[in-house]
Amino acid sequence: MRAKKFLAMAIALGMTVGLTSVPTLAADKKTFVFGDTTFNAENEEADINPQNTYAGWACIRYGVGETLFRYSDTMEIEPWVAKEYENVDELTWKITLNDGVVFSNGRACDGEAVKESLEGLIANNERAAGDLCIDSIEADGNTITIKTTEPKPALINYLSDPYGCIIDTEAGITDNGIVIGTGPYVATDLVTDDHLNLVKNEN
């Protein structure tokens, strides 16, 4: 009787292991396939366009986009695409970008590109526009100067929000919400509520 119980338990365990879903590595392709329950239209992550609702979370999560600043593991603000910032006065912020940052298509991520990205953000994302209260942005080489309509002591924190992923707006946004960013991956295909394909950023 004891042997039969042991055999039944072993069979049940084997079936459980067999049914467990695990990440798969496709043979000879170096392809990692995994599921994500948050990347869907219901969660307002229909694509990876950071200017679209909360899709900035997907843009940053999958390594396509990067923000000017980010939070460290200890929740401290640290540079990312940007190198440093200066709070010139209560309405003026000067941000210096890191040298040599490029988008995945090879375009330089300079002050003008960042200006375009932020202007597109506040034009298309109501939440970002309300948070940032940007009045004007000026670009000069590798720096941008932001003027706000009211004092914004937390401006750098807001620029660290995933909606602040810097994208190449000159390259445009595809109909299915694919953008060009500065991250380690490039999106090649996206179908909302189904899949997102990524390849290594060669730039």
List the model feature ranges, each with a label:
Residues 1-8:
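Bacterial N-terminal signal peptides that target proteins for export
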Residues 11, 15-19:
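Hydrophobic core
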Residues 19-29:
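Sec-dependent signal peptide cleavage junction
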Residues 29-40, 92-95, 114-117, 144-146, ...:
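Short, well-ordered beta-strand elements
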Residues 35-88, 180:
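N-terminal lobe/hinge region of extracytoplasmic solute-binding protein
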Residues 83-125:
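Aromatic- and charge-enriched surface segment that lines or borders ligand/interaction sites
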Residues 86, 94, 129-170, 184, ...:
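Surface-exposed binding/hinge segments that line
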Residues 178-203:
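Bilobed "Venus flytrap"/periplasmic-binding protein-like clamshell domains
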